[in-house]
């Protein structure tokens, strides 16, 4: 798991390889990731938007921006947490994701919180001995 804390808000990411959705012979590798956001600050905040930078093993960079996460803009009171899952396809067997969320505080001011960088790697293949 990967974790970052900004202004008392903790973002934890747990990536996992989706072997059944991947087709390595077609250069299609798919990962899922579970994100948990915990508001350990003293104010209510709302997640407004997201930004991801996805880099594959060849150095190709894809940027993704959008409103909220999985169609929602959750409000987190102090002590609340929010969890969601999403996915990412790549044409290489490894890559890196990093990003940030745009948040809004009680006073309406917006600020960014860090999504920690995390690696997407195909688990080592098990060797079968005959």
Curated annotation (Swiss-Prot):
It comes from the Bacteria. Disulfide bonds: none annotated. GO terms for biological process: error-free translesion synthesis. Residues 3-127 form the ApaG domain. HAMAP family: ApaG. PANTHER family: F-BOX ONLY PROTEIN 3, POLYMERASE DELTA-INTERACTING PROTEIN 2. This is Protein ApaG. The gene is apaG.
